[in-house]
Curated annotation (Swiss-Prot):
Residues 48-69 are annotated as: Disordered. This is Uncharacterized 7.7 kDa protein in gp5-gp4 intergenic region. Keywords: Late protein.
Length: 69
């Protein structure tokens, strides 16, 4: 079976990232992975450490002393 592999930095735009792309036989994949090729385009995307989803729903009530006078 043929599969596409990807490597950062190239002339093809893949998921918003410039990359090299090559179609190979799946039996050759381990060789290419050792050379820095990736088996899925999502692995080209940078991983963000603060990729926290905002909480949905109501905002929590503010704690204030305005009503305690």
């Amino acid at each position: 079976m043929k599969i596409a592999i990807y490597k950062p930095g190239g002339s093809i735009m893949v998921w918003g990232v410039m990359a090299q792309m090559k179609v190979i036989d799946s039996s050759e994949l381990p060789e290419y992975v050792k050379d820095g090729w990736l088996d899925h385009p999502s692995k080209l995307l940078p991983v963000e450490a603060d990729d926290v989803k905002p909480r949905k729903g109501r905002k929590p009530k503010a704690v204030s002393d305005a009503d305690k006078d």
